[in-house]
Amino acid sequence: MKPVSRVSLGIFPTPLQEISAERVGCGVPVRLFFKRDDLCGIGFGGNKIRKLEYLLADALERGCDSIVTGGGSQSNQTVAAAVSAAKLGLAAHLVIPESTGPVTRNMAKLAGAFLYEVENGQTNVLMKQIRAVAAGLKQEGHQPYIIPPGASTPLGALAYAEAMREMYGQAAERGIVFDHVICCGATGNTYAGVALGTKLYSPRTKSTV
């Protein structure tokens, strides 16, 4: 099987940090650990950087010169994609809702991204405009690479299966076996990777979204 390519964007491994249960208002005596992907060192951090390491590697292998993606008004994907693309010399074209705030807009513009507005952040609305932007770029002679909202692709899920290998390895070094791993998300793609990685690397652990 052909190895899956990955570019280096973030600073990994990220810390596995224990947090006091009382500190976060947990009313039962449990040990809580957080996988600190917010500290991966590029943009605002977060889960999209791992996904983009695989997706942008795929874009470069395909000879693409630009990416087209988008996200909701509160999505971290737009900024993550903009700064990651800039680091690799790719143009970033971002579809965002009209309600997107100034911080996201300004960060994306500082990274050199081109912004396109739509009326709302529903996935079907975003994808329609993402495809339209990509089609326009092709007509101009560019080679765009489409990344759907949430970076929700098989490569995106693979990124978090690999993140679980990293996390469970860190836990094992400290003699810890987790009972549960909990993941929040919107599209379900990150959780798919978490569930797969848990099945592979810590089958005794229950995964919950």
Regions found by a protein language model. Give the residues of each.
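PLP-dependent amino-acid enzyme catalytic core
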Residues: 1-209
